[in-house]
Amino acid sequence: MWIHPMPDPVALSIGPLAIRWYGLMYLAAFAQFIWLARIRIKQPHIARAGWKKEDIDDMLFYGVLGVIIGGRLGEVLFYDPSYYFSNPLEIFKVWKGGMSFHGGFLGVLLAMSIWARRQGRNVLDVWDFIAPMVPLGYAFGRLGNFINAELPGRIADASLPWAMIWPNVDNLPRHPSPLYQALVDGLLMFILLWLFARKERPRMAVGGMFALLYGSARFFTEYFRMPDYEVHFAGITISAGQMLSVPLIVLGIVMLLIAYRKKPA
Protein backbone atom coordinates (compact mmCIF):
# COMPACT_ATOMS: atom_id res chain seq x y z
CA MET A 1 0.00 0.00 0.00
CA TRP A 2 1.13 3.53 -0.79
CA ILE A 3 0.62 6.88 0.88
CA HIS A 4 0.02 9.91 -1.30
CA PRO A 5 3.16 12.07 -0.96
CA MET A 6 1.12 15.31 -0.80
CA PRO A 7 3.75 17.39 -2.63
CA ASP A 8 3.82 21.15 -2.43
CA PRO A 9 1.43 22.41 -5.15
CA VAL A 10 4.01 25.11 -5.94
CA ALA A 11 6.68 23.61 -8.19
CA LEU A 12 8.93 26.65 -8.31
CA SER A 13 9.02 30.13 -6.79
CA ILE A 14 10.77 33.03 -8.50
CA GLY A 15 10.54 35.97 -6.15
CA PRO A 16 6.84 36.67 -5.61
CA LEU A 17 5.91 34.48 -8.60
CA ALA A 18 4.70 30.99 -7.69
CA ILE A 19 4.66 28.44 -10.51
CA ARG A 20 2.25 25.64 -9.64
CA TRP A 21 2.35 22.04 -10.80
CA TYR A 22 -1.23 22.32 -12.01
CA GLY A 23 -0.30 25.20 -14.29
CA LEU A 24 2.75 23.32 -15.57
CA MET A 25 0.54 20.37 -16.50
CA TYR A 26 -1.71 22.66 -18.53
CA LEU A 27 1.36 24.14 -20.19
CA ALA A 28 2.50 20.62 -21.07
CA ALA A 29 -0.97 19.87 -22.46
CA PHE A 30 -0.88 22.87 -24.78
CA ALA A 31 2.72 22.07 -25.83
CA GLN A 32 1.82 18.51 -26.79
CA PHE A 33 -1.14 19.84 -28.78
CA ILE A 34 1.22 21.98 -30.90
CA TRP A 35 3.68 19.10 -31.32
CA LEU A 36 1.03 16.56 -32.38
CA ALA A 37 -0.77 19.06 -34.60
CA ARG A 38 2.46 19.71 -36.53
CA ILE A 39 2.80 15.97 -37.04
CA ARG A 40 -0.84 15.68 -38.07
CA ILE A 41 -0.70 18.37 -40.77
CA LYS A 42 1.96 16.27 -42.53
CA GLN A 43 -0.42 13.33 -42.92
CA PRO A 44 -1.40 13.21 -46.62
CA HIS A 45 -5.18 13.45 -46.16
CA ILE A 46 -4.78 16.37 -43.73
CA ALA A 47 -2.36 18.20 -46.04
CA ARG A 48 -4.83 17.79 -48.91
CA ALA A 49 -7.48 19.51 -46.79
CA GLY A 50 -5.31 22.63 -46.73
CA TRP A 51 -4.22 22.67 -43.09
CA LYS A 52 -1.13 24.82 -42.48
CA LYS A 53 1.24 25.43 -39.57
CA GLU A 54 -0.12 28.97 -39.19
CA ASP A 55 -3.57 27.55 -38.45
CA ILE A 56 -2.28 25.74 -35.37
CA ASP A 57 -1.09 28.81 -33.45
CA ASP A 58 -4.26 30.75 -34.26
CA MET A 59 -6.47 27.82 -33.30
CA LEU A 60 -4.56 27.23 -30.06
CA PHE A 61 -5.38 30.74 -28.83
CA TYR A 62 -9.10 30.05 -29.20
CA GLY A 63 -8.70 26.57 -27.74
CA VAL A 64 -6.91 27.82 -24.62
CA LEU A 65 -9.71 30.29 -23.93
CA GLY A 66 -12.32 27.60 -24.50
CA VAL A 67 -10.61 25.10 -22.19
CA ILE A 68 -10.02 27.52 -19.32
CA ILE A 69 -13.34 29.37 -19.41
CA GLY A 70 -15.46 26.32 -20.24
CA GLY A 71 -13.59 24.03 -17.85
CA ARG A 72 -13.93 26.42 -14.95
CA LEU A 73 -17.59 27.23 -15.60
CA GLY A 74 -18.28 23.51 -15.92
CA GLU A 75 -16.69 22.89 -12.51
CA VAL A 76 -18.80 25.68 -11.02
CA LEU A 77 -22.12 24.71 -12.60
CA PHE A 78 -21.89 20.91 -12.81
CA TYR A 79 -20.14 19.94 -9.59
CA ASP A 80 -20.31 22.49 -6.76
CA PRO A 81 -22.56 25.46 -7.64
CA SER A 82 -23.64 26.15 -4.05
CA TYR A 83 -20.03 26.59 -2.87
CA TYR A 84 -18.99 28.86 -5.71
CA PHE A 85 -22.14 30.96 -5.58
CA SER A 86 -21.49 31.46 -1.86
CA ASN A 87 -17.81 32.26 -2.56
CA PRO A 88 -17.85 33.91 -6.01
CA LEU A 89 -14.23 35.08 -5.87
CA GLU A 90 -13.14 31.42 -5.74
CA ILE A 91 -14.41 31.02 -9.30
CA PHE A 92 -11.45 33.02 -10.58
CA LYS A 93 -8.79 31.08 -8.63
CA VAL A 94 -8.10 28.62 -11.43
CA TRP A 95 -4.57 27.93 -10.15
CA LYS A 96 -6.03 26.06 -7.18
CA GLY A 97 -7.39 23.38 -9.51
CA GLY A 98 -10.95 22.44 -10.25
CA MET A 99 -11.61 22.13 -13.98
CA SER A 100 -14.40 20.11 -15.55
CA PHE A 101 -13.51 18.22 -18.72
CA HIS A 102 -17.13 18.23 -19.86
CA GLY A 103 -17.22 22.00 -19.41
CA GLY A 104 -13.91 22.35 -21.22
CA PHE A 105 -15.28 20.15 -24.01
CA LEU A 106 -18.24 22.48 -24.51
CA GLY A 107 -15.97 25.52 -24.26
CA VAL A 108 -13.64 24.18 -26.95
CA LEU A 109 -16.59 23.30 -29.21
CA LEU A 110 -17.83 26.88 -28.97
CA ALA A 111 -14.35 28.35 -29.44
CA MET A 112 -13.64 26.14 -32.45
CA SER A 113 -17.03 27.04 -33.95
CA ILE A 114 -16.08 30.72 -33.75
CA TRP A 115 -12.64 30.04 -35.22
CA ALA A 116 -14.04 27.88 -38.02
CA ARG A 117 -16.59 30.54 -38.96
CA ARG A 118 -13.89 33.21 -39.11
CA GLN A 119 -11.68 30.97 -41.26
CA GLY A 120 -14.46 29.79 -43.55
CA ARG A 121 -14.02 26.16 -42.48
CA ASN A 122 -16.62 23.57 -41.58
CA VAL A 123 -16.62 23.19 -37.79
CA LEU A 124 -16.96 19.40 -38.14
CA ASP A 125 -13.70 19.31 -40.11
CA VAL A 126 -12.04 21.36 -37.39
CA TRP A 127 -13.24 19.00 -34.68
CA ASP A 128 -12.06 15.98 -36.69
CA PHE A 129 -8.64 17.63 -36.94
CA ILE A 130 -8.15 18.49 -33.26
CA ALA A 131 -9.82 15.46 -31.62
CA PRO A 132 -6.73 13.16 -31.68
CA MET A 133 -4.67 15.79 -29.84
CA VAL A 134 -7.09 16.12 -26.91
CA PRO A 135 -6.61 12.85 -24.92
CA LEU A 136 -2.94 13.39 -24.02
CA GLY A 137 -3.74 16.92 -22.87
CA TYR A 138 -6.46 15.43 -20.68
CA ALA A 139 -3.90 12.98 -19.24
CA PHE A 140 -1.63 15.87 -18.22
CA GLY A 141 -4.60 17.53 -16.52
CA ARG A 142 -5.29 14.40 -14.50
CA LEU A 143 -1.63 14.22 -13.47
CA GLY A 144 -2.07 17.76 -12.17
CA ASN A 145 -5.09 16.60 -10.19
CA PHE A 146 -3.04 13.77 -8.70
CA ILE A 147 -0.18 16.06 -7.68
CA ASN A 148 -2.74 18.36 -6.03
CA ALA A 149 -4.25 15.32 -4.24
CA GLU A 150 -7.58 16.03 -5.93
CA LEU A 151 -10.24 13.56 -7.09
CA PRO A 152 -9.47 10.73 -4.63
CA GLY A 153 -10.70 7.28 -5.55
CA ARG A 154 -13.27 5.08 -3.92
CA ILE A 155 -12.23 2.82 -1.07
CA ALA A 156 -10.12 -0.10 -2.32
CA ASP A 157 -9.18 -3.49 -0.92
CA ALA A 158 -6.07 -3.11 1.23
CA SER A 159 -4.49 -6.04 -0.63
CA LEU A 160 -4.48 -4.06 -3.89
CA PRO A 161 -0.76 -3.40 -4.53
CA TRP A 162 -1.30 0.17 -5.72
CA ALA A 163 -4.00 1.13 -3.20
CA MET A 164 -3.20 4.52 -1.74
CA ILE A 165 -4.01 6.45 1.41
CA TRP A 166 -4.91 10.09 0.77
CA PRO A 167 -3.99 11.91 4.03
CA ASN A 168 -6.19 14.88 3.10
CA VAL A 169 -9.24 12.58 3.02
CA ASP A 170 -8.85 9.79 5.60
CA ASN A 171 -6.67 6.79 6.46
CA LEU A 172 -8.46 4.29 4.23
CA PRO A 173 -6.89 2.66 1.15
CA ARG A 174 -8.27 4.16 -2.04
CA HIS A 175 -7.92 3.79 -5.78
CA PRO A 176 -5.56 6.38 -7.35
CA SER A 177 -8.37 7.36 -9.71
CA PRO A 178 -6.65 10.35 -11.39
CA LEU A 179 -3.91 7.95 -12.54
CA TYR A 180 -6.52 5.50 -13.84
CA GLN A 181 -8.14 8.28 -15.83
CA ALA A 182 -4.80 9.57 -17.11
CA LEU A 183 -3.97 6.07 -18.39
CA VAL A 184 -7.37 4.95 -19.71
CA ASP A 185 -9.23 8.14 -20.65
CA GLY A 186 -5.95 9.75 -21.69
CA LEU A 187 -3.09 7.56 -22.92
CA LEU A 188 -5.07 4.51 -24.09
CA MET A 189 -7.68 6.67 -25.79
CA PHE A 190 -4.95 8.71 -27.51
CA ILE A 191 -3.38 5.56 -28.98
CA LEU A 192 -6.71 4.25 -30.29
CA LEU A 193 -7.88 7.58 -31.68
CA TRP A 194 -4.53 8.48 -33.24
CA LEU A 195 -4.40 5.14 -35.07
CA PHE A 196 -8.01 5.60 -36.21
CA ALA A 197 -7.34 9.13 -37.48
CA ARG A 198 -4.20 8.23 -39.43
CA LYS A 199 -6.38 7.14 -42.34
CA GLU A 200 -8.79 9.38 -44.17
CA ARG A 201 -12.24 9.08 -42.60
CA PRO A 202 -15.65 10.51 -43.49
CA ARG A 203 -16.51 13.89 -42.02
CA MET A 204 -17.57 13.56 -38.34
CA ALA A 205 -16.05 10.08 -37.96
CA VAL A 206 -12.99 11.11 -35.94
CA GLY A 207 -14.97 13.56 -33.80
CA GLY A 208 -17.67 10.93 -33.29
CA MET A 209 -15.11 8.30 -32.33
CA PHE A 210 -13.63 10.73 -29.80
CA ALA A 211 -17.02 11.35 -28.18
CA LEU A 212 -17.82 7.63 -28.06
CA LEU A 213 -14.41 6.56 -26.71
CA TYR A 214 -14.14 9.31 -24.12
CA GLY A 215 -17.73 8.94 -22.91
CA SER A 216 -17.30 5.17 -22.57
CA ALA A 217 -13.87 5.36 -20.91
CA ARG A 218 -14.98 8.05 -18.47
CA PHE A 219 -18.15 6.14 -17.59
CA PHE A 220 -15.98 3.11 -16.72
CA THR A 221 -13.25 4.90 -14.74
CA GLU A 222 -15.85 6.81 -12.72
CA TYR A 223 -16.55 3.55 -10.88
CA PHE A 224 -13.14 3.98 -9.19
CA ARG A 225 -13.43 7.69 -8.40
CA MET A 226 -15.09 9.06 -5.28
CA PRO A 227 -18.14 10.82 -6.76
CA ASP A 228 -18.73 14.53 -6.28
CA TYR A 229 -22.40 13.63 -6.04
CA GLU A 230 -24.60 10.81 -7.28
CA VAL A 231 -27.81 10.71 -9.27
CA HIS A 232 -30.51 8.13 -8.54
CA PHE A 233 -32.85 7.20 -11.38
CA ALA A 234 -35.10 4.15 -11.83
CA GLY A 235 -33.20 2.21 -9.20
CA ILE A 236 -29.83 3.01 -10.79
CA THR A 237 -27.16 5.12 -9.11
CA ILE A 238 -24.57 6.90 -11.24
CA SER A 239 -22.05 9.62 -10.52
CA ALA A 240 -22.19 13.14 -11.90
CA GLY A 241 -19.33 12.28 -14.27
CA GLN A 242 -21.20 9.25 -15.59
CA MET A 243 -24.37 11.28 -16.05
CA LEU A 244 -22.44 13.84 -18.12
CA SER A 245 -20.76 11.07 -20.14
CA VAL A 246 -23.97 9.43 -21.35
CA PRO A 247 -24.81 12.29 -23.78
CA LEU A 248 -21.27 12.04 -25.17
CA ILE A 249 -21.70 8.32 -25.84
CA VAL A 250 -25.03 8.95 -27.59
CA LEU A 251 -23.55 11.86 -29.56
CA GLY A 252 -20.60 9.73 -30.66
CA ILE A 253 -22.84 6.89 -31.87
CA VAL A 254 -25.10 9.30 -33.79
CA MET A 255 -22.12 11.05 -35.41
CA LEU A 256 -20.57 7.75 -36.49
CA LEU A 257 -23.86 6.49 -37.91
CA ILE A 258 -24.28 9.68 -39.91
CA ALA A 259 -20.64 9.65 -41.04
CA TYR A 260 -20.81 6.08 -42.31
CA ARG A 261 -24.35 6.07 -43.64
CA LYS A 262 -24.56 4.62 -47.11
CA LYS A 263 -24.92 7.17 -49.86
CA PRO A 264 -28.03 6.70 -52.00
CA ALA A 265 -27.28 5.12 -55.36
UniProtKB/Swiss-Prot annotation:
Highest taxon listed in the record's lineage: Bacteria
GO cellular component, one term: plasma membrane
One term of GO molecular function: phosphatidylglycerol-prolipoprotein diacylglyceryl transferase activity
Primary site of residence: membrane
Keywords from the named record: Cell inner membrane, Cell membrane, Membrane, Transferase, Transmembrane, Transmembrane helix
Membrane topology reported for the UniProt record: Multi-pass membrane protein
Stretches that traverse the bilayer: 17-37, 59-79, 94-114, 123-143, 177-197, 204-224, 238-258
Phosphoprotein found in the keyword field: no
Xref: Pfam families: LGT
Record-linked PROSITE patterns: LGT (PS01311)
Subcellular location: Cell inner membrane
Enzyme Commission no: 2.5.1.145
Pathway per the UniProt entry: Protein modification; lipoprotein biosynthesis (diacylglyceryl transfer)
Homology family: Belongs to the Lgt family.
Role played: Catalyzes the transfer of the diacylglyceryl group from phosphatidylglycerol to the sulfhydryl group of the N-terminal cysteine of a prolipoprotein, the first step in the formation of mature lipoproteins.
Name of the protein in question: Phosphatidylglycerol--prolipoprotein diacylglyceryl transferase
Species per Swiss-Prot/TrEMBL record: Janthinobacterium sp. (strain Marseille) (Minibacterium massiliensis)
Organism placement in taxonomy: Bacteria, Pseudomonadati, Pseudomonadota, Betaproteobacteria, Burkholderiales
Gene field: lgt
